[in-house]
């Protein structure tokens, strides 16, 4: 990893959880992100999980895999899973990975 990585969780109190990811998502941090998303998706009180990439500056294939892992676990537990605010090279990485159809990539937001 060449840059900082931070994650902040916000619970809206009504079953919605927003995971805000900042910095770079690469191989060095992808496992940690996967575990964070899995943990959030497995919480009984969660109905909708949003991963906000508005301040994410880089994502490689390992980062894409983390999002897909989080989505898979969320859907298995009956949760909605949304990736929001994918911009610039992060959006391009999601398109290049071929997950646009699966994640419904649309106007800076990814929804599943």
Predicted regions and their residues:
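STAS-like cytosolic regulatory interaction modules
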Residues: 1-58, 68-112
